[in-house]
Amino acid sequence: MKILQINCVYDYGSTGKITRDIHRGLQNNRVDSTVLYGRRQKVQEAGVYKTCTEFEAKAWNVLSRLTGRPYAVTPFGTLTLLHRLEREKPDVVHLQCINGYFVDIYRLLNYLKKNHIPTVLTLHAEFMYTGNCGHAFECNEWKTGCHNCPNQKEAINSTRNGAAAWNWKKMKEAFEGFDDLILCPVSDWVGERATQSPVLKQYPIRTVLNGIDTDIFHYREKEALVLREKLNVGDRKMILHVTASYTDPVKGGKFITELSQRLDSEKYVVVVVDGLNNPPPKDFCGIYYGRANGQEELAAFYSAADVMVLTSYRECLPTTCLESLCCGTEIVSFYFHGDEGEGSFPEKYVHFIPHGDMEQLTDTVKNVSEHHEEKKICCEAGRKIFSQKVMVENYEKIYKKLLKQSTD
């Protein structure tokens, strides 16, 4: 059995690491595995190929603002990717996150469909069934064709008249007529949304939770003590916020700033780890650390914290939550599916509250930080659900089932 994954990046960001973990996990299980990716650094690793130049991807990023078509891009990169597909002749193609201006999504889907290649599609975000935006929020235009998109500029970075409706129609056409396609949302909520979309509702769904490297993300007691001393936390409760971008409005950094003002600085300290090194506002009252120096240090931050706080407006299945739980630290989070939490998480260790309710956020953070479960117990609960080993095993089962189905 030969599996070929396609993702925008490799070994970078959440989807890049997931793609890497599946690739290496399959190889360890003696499954023939290949990865094609389009953005960032060129990786020197067996079976991993970069298919698009940064120049072409960036050029089409700009051009797509004029055309309004962010998924009909990069002809040379697309041709390179399709040629590699022909050369590799995989039994199953696994599509991860394929936005990022490195491939023409419609051409890729039509190629897979025309050549009857069994395909697994992981839904990390919403754009594959909205046809446009990564998060639809309260908008329901994606259910009927995006004819009156209220947020087109934010959704596709273009104001071209009718662009959202065109994109939706093209995505629907590209998905029509697949012989063997299975959808793998990363959470039940994403899967439920996909069943409401005319683009994807006709295909079978199997939720596969993301997994992380629990050899890295586990409770690190010694490193935690060293880090708390380094940060001069003392006897205070350490409130951790890990974010890809503190200044991104969707990530809710403003709520962390307000939380830092509400908490007694003699009893609590808010610590921010920010992937983009965006400094918080001047009125932030805590420790802004910036980007962690590698995965091991990030695991030490989770291990050192008394509670991890998530304040995003929308998330599908945030990797930070998986990492925190596997390091033994409970989570306080706004509902990241509107008015819903995520049933995939062990309820005992993840505490959801209504978005924007600062009184309840403050009270819950205080309570959890002072009465949290023993670290090792929380860590073990996380490992049972979110380890990369479990994720790879689940995907292997799906590959085999899909391949058998296609040959019957």
List PLM regions with ranges.
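A short, active-site helix/loop in glycosyltransferases that binds the activated sugar's phosphate group
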Residues: 130-134, 158-205, 212-216
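Conserved donor-binding/catalytic core segment of Leloir-type glycosyltransferases
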Residues: 184, 232-251, 257-260
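Nucleotide-activated donor-binding/catalytic signature segment of Leloir-type glycosyltransferases, i.e.
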Residues: 274-296
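Short alpha-helical donor nucleotide-sugar binding micro-motif in glycosyltransferases
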Residues: 300-305
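Aromatic "clamp/platform" in nucleotide-sugar-dependent glycosyltransferases that forms part
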Residues: 313
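Short hydrophobic beta-strand element within catalytic cores of glycosyltransferases
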Residues: 330-333
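Conserved acidic donor-binding segment of nucleotide-sugar-dependent glycosyltransferases
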Residues: 350-358, 367-372
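A short, well-ordered alpha-helix in the C-terminal region of glycosyltransferases
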Residues: 373-387, 394-397
